[in-house]
Amino acid sequence: MAMEVKICGLRHPAQAQAIAALGFTTLGFICVEASSRYVSSREIELVLQSLTAHNKRSAIGVFANVSLPKLGEFLAQTSLNGIQLHGDESPDFCRQVKQAFPQHRLIKALRLRRSADLERAEAYYNAVDVLLLDAYHPEQLGGTGQTLPWQKLQQFRPPLPWWLAGGLTPSNVQEALNLLQPDGIDLSSGVEQGPADKDVAKVAQLRAQLDALAILQH
């Protein structure tokens, strides 16, 4: 089973280098100003410039309820090659983003409050490249540390790649992946010491747990 692993909420170049050296080269940057993990376009470029070409495989900016012009303005200032929409974006808006930025991989996060929320996923099947399932929090868009009810997701098999997020840590990732077969996983608070301050030792523990499951990145 090949699986992509995204480490999200990066800010510090040295931490990004260490994480990439562990084999995790899908990196996420929070571009939502209200978030404690927010990074500016300049900070993102400092991180990406610190990485070798080999380790720059996928740099994803996380946005929420941003206008198309504002999104374009931010993307023009960075070398991001992926867009993650983590707010209340409609399928139609996602299609507009995909049309405006066809070279960027488009990920839509669905924050699940209840199992029935999964029904919303179908409307996005032909609008995005990847679906990401995250836990709902009334005040935070992500990085909440809250997990999803994994057993209730076992029948979720959309016709496009999907990633699992929500409270994943080195301690519980094996349990989650024994129950589910996502195409990717997304970790933030589970591998950090504080907002945007990644714990490289925890990332190394994550690598060891995934190696034990013989899960390789693409």
Curated annotation (Swiss-Prot):
Keywords, A to Z?
A: Amino-acid biosynthesis, Aromatic amino acid biosynthesis, Isomerase, Tryptophan biosynthesis
Write down the Pfam families for this protein, in alphabetical order. PRAI
- UniProt key word Lipid metabolism: no
Q: Which domain of life is it from?
A: Bacteria
Biological process, per Gene Ontology:
L-tryptophan biosynthetic process
- Organism of this sequence: Synechocystis sp. (strain ATCC 27184 / PCC 6803 / Kazusa)
Pathway of this protein? Answer: Amino-acid biosynthesis; L-tryptophan biosynthesis; L-tryptophan from chorismate: step 3/5
| Keyword Magnesium (UniProt) | no
In terms of InterPro entries, this protein maps to: Aldolase_TIM, PRAI_dom, RibuloseP-bd_barrel, TrpF_fam
Catalysed reactions listed for this entry: N-(5-phospho-beta-D-ribosyl)anthranilate = 1-(2-carboxyphenylamino)-1-deoxy-D-ribulose 5-phosphate
**So what family is this one in?**
Belongs to the TrpF family.
Q: What is this protein called?
A: N-(5'-phosphoribosyl)anthranilate isomerase
Q: Name one GO molecular function term.
A: phosphoribosylanthranilate isomerase activity
Supply the EC number(s).
5.3.1.24
